[in-house]
Amino acid sequence: VPPIRRDAPVKTGSTVKDGGAIFYDSHMHTPLCKHAYGEPEEYAAQGLRAGLRGIIFTCHCPMPNAFWPTVRMDEAEFDAYVAMVGKATQKFKGKLDVWLGLESEYYPGYEKYIEELHQRADFHFILGSVHWQSKEYLGKFENGTIEGFRRTYFNHLADSAESGLYDCLGHPDLVKNYHPDSWCFPILKEHVSRCLDRIAATGVAMELNTSGLNKSYHEMNPGNEFLGMMAERGIPLVIGSDAHRSARVGEHFIQALENAKAAGYKEVNYFEWRKRKALKLDAVLESLKKYEAAKAI
């Protein structure tokens, strides 16, 4: 990992005037991940159209040793990532907050690399994800039953929270897309409950990822019962579209907020300079519904 930057700029907060949009889409990508399309400015323009106050880019982090290289930026592209987000930040200053984040891999044994990576730029938000789809993960952990593999995934999700490396855990039940036809949450509920207890003890947030509606198991990540278990434990909630195309910025956010409210949540969150900021869920829902109504006129 290259050395830590020593020329960090003075940190400033939101440049958007109060009184309008209030919420942030906290998960989206850039073409550097090799499977997303459109420049950051296009995502920002869609953020304005979606009635958001800001967006946070969380492109897939670089990894050493050619770890699943087809879905992430190369290590040599990291500075270009920081620069391209920074360019959009300046272009939309005063209109929409465009902030730098990172979707960081959790894979046992790479913690030191990830810790050092997080020091290379001034991030607003670090989203930790366990990606069971990688050949590395499948090769090491797919060595028993389907349910056993899923339990291993949830163990790693809790491990990632306990590592202290991440602000929030991304798409927490992503593993339901592993043999989706056999997914049965009640079978795993007790195990998930224990893992959520571990996560709740850390104070780390968890994401409600709306892109699950576009995956093989057609449901947000997590599903509603899982979401309710998070709410019962007081686990802070962040919402992200996981947009890989600009048109999906802010997609399904009203439905996501309604799901969260039904699950028992009263607040939703975003991160600024890696500090969690809470908003009243009803206020966020009202702001987005008003914006949708105004567009329809």
Q: What function would you assign to each model-found segment?
A:
Residues 68-202, 283-297:
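Extended substrate/RNA-proximal surfaces in nucleic-acid metabolism proteins
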Residues 60, 131, 174-177, 211, ...:
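Flexible loop residues that form catalytic
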Residues 52, 123, 165-166, 235, ...:
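A structural motif
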Residues 24-28, 55-57, 98-102, 126-128, ...:
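Hydrophobic faces of well-ordered beta-strands that scaffold small-molecule active sites
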